[in-house]
Each structure stands twice: as C-alpha cells, then as structure tokens.
Amino acid sequence: IIYYISNMLQKKILFSQSSVSLEIIGLPDHSNDEKRDQISIISQWKLMIIDKPLIEGDVNHLSSIIDAFLTYSNFIINEDNSFYESKLIDIKKENFYTHSILLKSSKENVKPLNIKIGNSVLSDILNCFDQFKASDKVRNIRSNVIFKIPRKNKFKLKNKDKITSIILPPLI
C-alpha cells in the first residue's frame, strides 16, 4: 500500500521536441510550501528518443547527462573539440551529420549502450534540456557547464595609412 500511495503523490512533467521527450518524475517539497504541481525532489527521469532505447536514471545522472550534452554542443559551436568523455557518457562526432553516444551504466555487469543520432535529434535533445532548465515547474539542478562564447573576427587596425588609402578617394 505504501508504494501505491507514494506513486499517487508523484508528479510527472513532460518536455517534448519533435523526436525527443524528457519526463521528470518526483515530488513537491511541502516543507518549503511549494505548489502541488511543482517537482522539487526528482526521483527519476526518462529520456525517450524515437527508435532508440529508453535512457533513464536518478537526479545525479540527469545532471551529468545535461552537462555532457551542453559541453559537447559548445565544443561543436566553437569548433574546438568534437569529443566529450566522462565516467558516465562519451559523445563524439562521427561525421558532419552523425554523433555517437556511449552511455556507461553505474550498475555493475551492465554493458555500455551505444546510440547514434543525427544533428536534428541532437538539437531536439538540447531543446528538451533547455525547456527543463527554463521551467518553473521543476527545481533547477546545478550545472557545471561554463559556456565559451566564440569571439568574432575583429578588424584590427595596424596601419593607419593603409586604412586611410582604402577609405578616402585618391587626391589629385
């Protein structure tokens, strides 16, 4: 009976984008007088990608997965490194269109899961994570990602005489 009651109290919030859905399951924190429709204590999450196995775990796994995807996408944007590696997940760029994700289980005797996704699915996953992070219905988990914003090529003025001859018309 206890399992049934606690299961009834749990809330589920779904974040979706085209081929990907992120489901957050948990409870509101009544000690902080939070609303009943909020989730502050995340007990489980599920990442569902069309035609791929279900990916799920606890809140620590979710934080690591989000950090991995955000860091990897930042690498791609900055054209730095197209490989991310951690003890839980590896993501690497196979080619211009395909990314390989290796998920390592925290449980013993469970083989790693290798998934290949395209750019559109990667974008959908990132969109779901962005929806989750922006939501006021779910407690925001801590992220360790520091974004490196690419610097635009700046026009450097080294020789003032050269620039003057380019801008001004020739004087006769």
Residue ranges and their predicted role:
Residues 152-172:
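C-terminal single-pass membrane-anchor helix
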Residues 1-153:
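Cytosolic/nucleoplasmic/matrix-facing N-terminal domains/tails
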